[in-house]
């Protein structure tokens, strides 16, 4: 009986990942593109998708600081993904990034890891956020090499 309930609990879908899936797929799809004809249109799509993420996550019961931290992670992930493409690095994306639009900040690589460290202090409460950040890392988020410094500091 106890084993069945733990299997059921572990098989539940992470609401943040479920809400972010369209955005994550879209960002992953542009990672290896050679050109982007309409960068402002793409930015508009991501702004709309982040707003939709918010609505979907709230409908699934997420809110407050956890939702804000998840949105922050997604903004930094998308911004870094775009800026690491040949066309994104030559664009004005950095000047009008998702992070600047949603959080009035221009650099979020290190804060992503501050949020991660804070979430790890209460993993049971923050599991959905931790898993979402893990997905961002697995899809290539590096915090512009901040991850190397962060990992080294954990190994010492």
Give the ranges of each region predicted by the language model:
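Membrane-proximal low-complexity regions enriched in glycine and acidic/polar residues
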Residues: 68, 73-148
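Non-catalytic, solvent-exposed interaction/assembly segments
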Residues: 1-80
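Juxtamembrane amphipathic/hinge helix adjacent to a transmembrane helix
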Residues: 151-156
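Cationic, amphipathic, low-complexity alpha-helical segments enriched
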Residues: 1, 147-150
């Amino acid at each position: 009986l106890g084993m069945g309930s733990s299997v059921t609990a572990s098989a539940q879908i992470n609401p943040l990942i479920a809400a972010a899936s369209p955005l994550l797929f879209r960002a992953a799809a542009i990672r290896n593109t050679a050109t982007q004809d309409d960068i402002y249109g793409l930015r508009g799509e991501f702004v709309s998708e982040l707003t939709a993420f918010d609505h979907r996550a709230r409908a699934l019961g997420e809110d407050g600081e956890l939702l804000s931290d998840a949105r922050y992670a997604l903004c930094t992930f998308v911004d870094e993904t775009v800026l690491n493409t040949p066309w994104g690095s030559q664009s004005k994306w950095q000047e009008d990034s998702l992070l600047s639009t949603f959080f009035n900040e221009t650099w979020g690589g290190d804060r992503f890891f501050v949020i991660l460290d804070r979430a790890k202090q209460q993993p049971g409460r923050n599991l959905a956020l931790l898993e979402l950040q893990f997905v961002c890392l697995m899809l290539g988020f590096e915090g512009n090499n901040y991850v190397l410094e962060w990992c080294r500091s954990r190994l010492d």
